[in-house]
Amino acid sequence: MPNRASKSTRRAALSIALILASTAPAAMAQGYADAVALLTPLPLATTDAKAVDARCTDLLTGIGKARAALEARTGRATMAADFTAYDALQMTISDGGGEMYTVSQTNSDAAVRTAAETCYQKISDLSTQIGLSRPIYNRLSAIPTRGLDKASAFTLAKMLTTYRLAGVDKDDATRAQITQLQKEITETGVQFGANIRDDKGDMTLKPEELAGMPQDWLDAHKPAADGFVHLTYDYPDVVPVFEFASIRATRQKVLTGFSNRAWPKNQAVLKTLLEKRYALARLLGYTDYAQLVTADKMIGSPERAAGFLDDANVAAKPGAEADYAELLAFAKTVDPSIERLETWDNSYMKNLLRKQKYAVDAAEVRQYFTYDKARAGIFKLMGDLFGADIRPWDTPVWDKSVTAWELYDGQRLIGRFYLDMHPRAGKYNHAAQFPIRTGVEGQQIPVGALICNFPATGAMDHRDVETFLHEFGHLIH
C-alpha cells in the first residue's frame, strides 16, 4: 500500500513467515488460514464494475474482521500466535491492494478501473488506520523478546519502530489528522499516476521528418488520411525515434511531448502531494518529508543521503566528463551546428558512435529480437540458470494479449505469473512487476504480473530486451 507506515511494515514483515515456520508451523498455518481463504479467488479478468465493488466489500470485511480479532486478543502475547496474526493481516492488505491495483492499471473498461482505484484507496485508508492502532501496537509490544532468535527479535523491533514513526504514540486528535493526511496523500498519488496513464498523446509528424527510422518501424507507422504520422506516448512509438531519427528537431519534438505527459494537469496535483507530505512530516515532528522517510532507513538522514550522492558524483564525474567530451566531439562531425548535447541527442549519437567505433549497428541488432523470441530466450535462461520449468497456466486473463504461466521446480509448483506486455488504451504505460499474491509455504502460491509496453509485432530494441529481463528478474525474486 502506498502510505508510508504500511509499506514499511509490509517490507519488514515479509520475512516473518519463514522465521515462524521453523518455530511453530502449526500455529503459523492456523494463523494464515483465514487470509488464504479470502485471497484464494483471483478475479483479475472481471468485466463488471459491480463485481469489483462486491469483491472490494469482501476484502474490506475480511481485513476488518482480522483487525478486530487482533485488537481483541488477550492473554500471553507470542510471536507464533500474535505476530503471525499480524503478518496475515498485513498480507491480506498487501495482496488485496495488489489485486485491486493490478485491475486498476490493466482493465480496458474505464468503469472497472475506477471501481478498482476506489477500492485500492479504501484498502489503503484501512491500512493507515491499522498502522495507527494502539491495541495492535500494545499487543506486539507485549511479545517477550527474551529467547527470540536474532531474526525474530530484529523483525519485531522493526515493526514497533514503524508504528512509532507512523504516529501511534500521538494523541487521538493528532492520529485523526494523520489518518486524513494519509488518505489525501494516497488519493493524490493515485490521481498523479492515473493522469500519466491516461494521457496517450497524439504527436503529428510529416513522413519526411522521420528520416533515419528503421523500415519495420515505418511499416508499423503509416501516414493517416491527413498525411501525417500520428504517434502516441507509448514506448514502441517514441523510443525508436530517440535512437534513430536523424533530424534533430524531430527527436526534440517527440522527447518534449513525451516528457510533458499529463502536463499541465499534474502540476497542481504534484504541488498538492508535496504539500500534504510536508504537512504529514511536520505533524509527526520532523523538519520535512525527506527527514521522515529516511528516519528508519539505512542511510538515516537527508544529510547522509545528500552526502552519498555528492560522493558518487565526485567519483563518477571524471569518467562522465570524458564520455561527454568524446560524444560531443563525435556529434560535431555528424552535425557541425551542435554546440552542446541535449537530452534528445544522447541515444541517437551513442548509437552512431557505437556503430563507428565497435561496428555495432542498433538498427541491425533490432532484427534479431521480436517479442516472442525474447520471451522464449528469457524462459530458456531461467531454465539454464535455475532449472526452472515454465508452463502455460490455464486461467482467465483480462485481455486477449495477456498470457499466463506457471513456474515449476521439477514437479513442484512454486509460482504463477501473468505477462501483459503490449500497449493499449487505459493501461499502465511504463514497465513494472506487480505483486499480486504473497507466497506462504504449503498454503499460498506466489503470483505476480509483468506489466510492460513492448511492440506486439515487429522488431524490439535491445534496450527493450534488457528491460524485459530486468523486470523478469524482479518477478523471479
Question: Where are the predicted features?
Answer:
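N-terminal helix-rich structural modules
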Residues: P2, Q30-M213, H230
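Bacterial N-terminal signal peptides that target proteins for export
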Residues: P2-L14
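Bacterial N-terminal signal peptides
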Residues: A13-A24
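Sec/Tat signal peptide C-region and signal peptidase I cleavage site
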Residues: P25-A29
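Short His/Asp/Glu-rich catalytic/ion-coordination signatures at enzyme active sites or charged loops
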Residues: A37-A51, E99-C119, S141-Q180, L231-Q267, ...
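Active-site-proximal, well-structured secondary-structure segments within enzyme catalytic domains
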Residues: T155-L156, E187, A194, D199-T232, ...
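Active-site recognition of the HExxH zinc-binding catalytic motif
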Residues: R463-H477
